[in-house]
A protein has these predicted regions:
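Conserved C-terminal RecA-like helicase domain
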Residues: 1-57, 84-98
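Beta-edge loop/turn motif
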Residues: 42-79, 103
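C-terminal helicase module of SF1/SF2 nucleic-acid helicases/translocases
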Residues: 104, 111-212
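C-terminal or late-domain output modules
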Residues: 77-78, 82, 87-99, 142-158, ...
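C-terminal accessory/interaction regions of large nucleic acid-associated machines
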Residues: 8, 168-180, 219-442
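Conserved segment of the helicase C-terminal RecA-like domain
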Residues: 39, 70, 74-84, 89-137
Length: 442
């Protein structure tokens, strides 16, 4: 290993709590590359593969393979389908996704030509001179490398939203999000941000002679937005709803919860985490809406039915893990905390799958966003005299602190000023304690 790789390997071991929990080992001739891996693990895998005397093979998942920029001689695409995380079923890859993955073979400045082998799913069998590949497979291969790729068919996503609204699909997640994002809009020609009638969807409707139908759909959208606006009188809430995509009514309830807490507000990031979890446990709509993207992971971690809605019991199970994350505990300890809370016994922690889901999915894709909304609501939705009772430095640090895994804004600042690229969260906590014991930090 190079010096940089050794530092990355030390960071990986510190973050996980030992080498036995990692997907990698320094002697690997083949390395994985997937979303369950820590950032430092992926960096190490890429570095090992990049070296001519390093790993010979890198095995990447479908999505991540499209982003790898490594000098591969041969790209083997093990199937043209992938698992859908939401439905749990297999789905076909689009032609451009296969092309992106195939483009990993060869790299400008390193290897002009590369070889790509696509293994279809399911496997095909045919005999020379007797059978021929199915026509749909030939069509897919031709679509991957078209004769003329200069022209693209483009469409306006707004057109899809308007069609769903015209069909009264008001509970569709995309429709709800669009209406929320327009919470502070006025559907006037003078609209400073964006005039829907001058959108690409509007242009296409005019060209196709469907202007009246398009205008009718816009009127339905306008009426839905205005109906939401009539329920909220605080323009600051409407603005935040527009910025975040969260329903203004939900933000209003969160605002009242914050006001109720002003008498004895949380005094640490850990107390803010517990405060937020108590709110999510008590508010079914907030829990369902704000945790929708990570609901499957939360339920998987808690050992409950994966497709069920997030419930208070599931949040109680992951809470110790979140507190352990910000306290600087390694993932093996966080895994044990989650298992203990879920009352699950196991002989081996394996690769700490539950803790990895918490660190790689639930925290960055769910909790970080929610804490960002809390910070914005405190700064923009509470009167100035109310803000004076709160530690605003801590409020501003809530989202990045939970994302990076620190329990104070001071540690967050310490981590951002440290120049060590490979340093992990656990190592930073240890360095902070060391500096404090030496009297270098008050």
């Amino acid at each position: 290993m190079t010096d940089v790789e050794l530092r990355l390997w030390e960071a990986v071991q510190a973050e996980l709590g030992g080498p036995e929990y990692s997907f990698l080992s320094p002697e690997n001739v083949a390395v994985p590359h997937n979303s369950a891996m820590l950032r430092q693990e992926r960096q190490l895998a890429e570095s090992m593969f990049r070296r001519t005397d390093g790993a010979d093979v890198i095995v990447a998942t479908t999505t991540l393979a499209q982003g790898l920029n490594l000098p591969a001689h041969l790209a083997i695409l093990a199937g043209d389908m992938r698992a859908n995380a939401k439905t749990g079923e297999r789905e076909k890859l689009a032609a451009h996704e296969i092309l992106n993955a195939a483009a990993r073979a060869g790299r400008a400045g390193h290897l002009a030509n590369g070889l790509v082998l696509l293994i279809p799913e399911p496997l095909l069998s045919f005999k020379d001179g007797k059978d021929s590949p199915p026509a749909d497979l030939i069509k897919k291969l031709e679509s991957i490398l078209p004769n003329d790729d200069k022209c693209l068919n483009i469409s306006d996503p707004l057109e899809i939203i308007l069609d769903k609204i015209s069909q009264a699909h008001w509970n569709n997640a995309d429709v709800i999000y669009t209406i929320n994002r327009m919470s502070d809009w006025t559907f006037e020609p003078s609209q400073p941000l964006f005039n829907i009638k001058k959108s690409f969807a509007g242009y296409c409707a005019a060209v196709q002679g469907l202007q009246q139908e398009f205008d009718r759909k816009v009127e339905l959208l306008s009426a839905a937005v205005e109906e939401r606006q009539e329920l909220i009188f605080d323009h600051k809430l409407l603005t935040l709803a527009s910025q975040s995509g969260i329903p203004a009514q939900l933000l209003a309830r969160l605002q009242m919860r914050l006001i109720d807490a002003l008498g004895s507000p949380p005094s640490s990031i850990h107390e803010w985490i517990q405060w937020l979890f108590e709110w999510l446990m008590s508010d079914n709509e907030a829990r369902t809406y704000l945790l929708a993207e990570v609901a499957r992971d939360i339920m998987t971690i808690s050992g409950q039915e994966k497709e069920a809605s997030v419930n208070p019991a599931a949040l109680k199970i992951i809470l110790p893990g979140v507190l352990g994350w910000t306290s600087g505990h390694p993932l093996c300890t966080i895994e044990q905390q989650i298992l203990s809370a879920a009352q699950i016994t196991t002989k081996s922690l394996g690769t700490c799958d539950r803790a990895r889901k918490l660190a790689n999915s639930i925290i960055p894709r769910g909790l970080t966003f929610i804490f960002g909304v809390v910070s914005q609501l405190v700064k923009n939705g509470l009167p100035s005299e109310a803000q004076n009772t709160l530690d605003l430095k801590m409020i501003e640090a809530l989202s990045p602190a939970i994302r990076q895994g620190y329990d104070s804004w001071e540690k967050l600042a310490f981590a951002s000023t440290d120049g060590s690229v490979a340093l992990s969260r656990v190592q930073t906590h240890a360095k902070w304690k060391e500096a404090k014991d030496m009297g270098l930090i008050d």
